[in-house]
Amino acid sequence: MTRYLGVALCFVWGSTILGAANKDSRLENCGVVMQEILDVPDNIPQELLETAECVIVIPSMTKVALGIGGSYGRGAMVCRTGAAFDGPWGAPAMYALEGGSVGFQLGAESTDVVFLVMNTRGVDALLSSKVKLGGSVSAAAGPKGRSLEASTDVSMRSEILSYSRARGLFAGVSLEGTSLRPDDEASEEVYGRTVTARGIVMGPGTSVPESGRHLVDVLEKNAPYNESQKKESR
């Protein structure tokens, strides 16, 4: 058991070091993953993508299990601008996913994960501190397909909806028990200055870095800003 633990920890630490080597590449990969997921025929319902206040993309989340397993991933969150988070898409902030999972066999599984943050309470929690899904914020597997006809009340009431893609299969997935937190160190490396997730998302005039342009462009193309959807007019 000790030997397995050492192997798994070496895998995690080694992957973390490699992941930290190039934050720009990680951010660019977020755009690639988001585009590929939206190209799937039965993907995220258009209505949900359009009304989401933020989108988090975690490429290659890895689960490592030792009886009681763990998961980790690094990615980015993009939110709509404006005090009510209902404007055009803004600049990305880097985020980290961490947590435990029970029941995995010894080994690792890589999965791309997308979260939709559906209301301001969820956004504020994510900008403030580390958030445990299913704890301080409600979370559920997101419905998929072109419409919301098959969605459940649970998913529609949740603050965060989660989706995954593994081995070419895309589906809503529950990630309760995992945690999301701002990765401000990674954001500082991307922007070249001292920044926080809240400052990036809510601060005035934060420019989208070149490495994040593809991700923002994908969101603008698939869920463009629409003046009629502003919350004040709903």
Map each language-model feature to its residues.
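Positively charged n-region of N-terminal signal peptides that target proteins for export
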Residues: 1-4
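Bacterial N-terminal signal peptides
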Residues: 6-16
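Small-residue-enriched, tightly packed secondary-structure blocks
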Residues: 20-234
